[in-house]
A protein has these predicted regions:
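Alpha-helical sensor/transducer elements of the RecA-like P-loop NTPase core
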Residues: 17, 36-39, 67-71, 102-113, ...
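Preference for short coil/turn "hinge" residues that link or interrupt alpha-helices
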Residues: 16-19, 26-27, 56, 144, ...
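Contiguous N-terminal and early-domain "leader" segments and peripheral loops that mark the onset or edge
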Residues: 6, 22-30, 57, 61-63, ...
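Short, flexible hinge/linker loops that cap or flank conserved catalytic cores
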Residues: 25, 135-137, 176
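Conserved adenine-nucleotide phosphate-binding loops and their immediately adjacent elements
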Residues: 2-43
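Residue-level "hotspot" positions that anchor or transmit function at local structural transition points
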Residues: 31-34, 124, 162
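Post-nucleotide-binding-loop coupling segment downstream of the phosphate-binding loop, primarily
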Residues: 38-48, 52-159, 200, 219
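Conserved beta-strand positions that form and line the central face of beta-propeller blades
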Residues: 32-33, 89, 205
């Protein structure tokens, strides 16, 4: 009997991993992470708890928000993302040589299409956000939104409020109900979901690395500590 050709071989679908993954739009960061054990535990706990829908990491530039989340994603990947059905990451800072920031419209078009919306252009901005939330929330979805601050109001009377109605709707809906988890990194607390901080959308202020953890990171990067330190 002649051997079966590759096109005729029946392959069983792989189990134990997400149906779809897209993380290429997240920023490229270093692989070395030190002194973030409590933050990793916080993320693991949030993913395991059904009552937690959104977590937000708050810190200024350079503290390591994106590096932390990328490291956690690598840990999740090694365990087939722990029951996640869909994994999607987006940075509001464009990657590559062009740089700049991405708009809410760009985000909506990409995410509605990726999550299977039949007509991403249909409806108002608010309606699109609500529709996207439904597509995300009713599956065990891991959604990572990196660098939200370009779409938030700066410090002032409306500090931290998201300026785009579509994202306001998305985040409000996910805070109210979400079978999975949305992880946000930003420089400012998200005012639109502040009323959920004590329940389904806790925030975590990311601290600077301790001196010991910082020294380990420098050694890993091949940088010698100064004698004065």
């Amino acid at each position: 009997m002649p051997p079966a050709s590759p096109s005729n071989i029946s392959r069983k679908p792989l189990t134990g991993g997400p149906e779809k993954i897209s993380v290429a739009r997240l920023p490229v960061t270093g692989s070395d992470v030190f002194g973030r054990e409590e933050d990793i535990a916080f993320l693991n706990d949030a993913w395991a708890k059904q009552q937690v829908n959104i977590v937000t990491f708050i810190a200024w530039a350079g503290v390591g928000k994106s590096t932390l989340v990328n490291h956690w994603l690598r840990l999740m990947s090694a365990e087939h993302y722990h029951s996640a059905q869909l994994v999607f990451g987006w940075s509001f800072y464009r990657q590559g040589s062009g740089g700049g920031t991405s708009s809410a419209d760009e985000f909506l078009d990409a995410t509605l299409t990726w999550f299977g919306d039949p007509d991403p252009r249909l409806g108002t901005a608010w309606e699109k956000g609500e529709r996207l939330a439904k597509l995300i929330a009713h599956r065990r979805t891991l959604l990572v939104l990196d660098g939200l601050e370009p779409l938030q109001n700066p410090p002032g009377p409306q500090a931290g409020r998201v300026r785009e109605p579509s994202l306001q709707a998305l985040l409000r809906e996910l805070a109210a109900f979400n079978k999975g988890l949305c992880v946000i990194t930003t420089r400012l607390p998200v005012a639109d979901i502040a009323d959920y901080e004590c329940t389904s959308a806790p925030r975590r202020d990311l601290e600077q690395l301790s001196s010991e953890a910082g020294a380990k990171l420098l050694r890993a990067l091949g940088i010698k500590e100064s004698v004065t330190q």
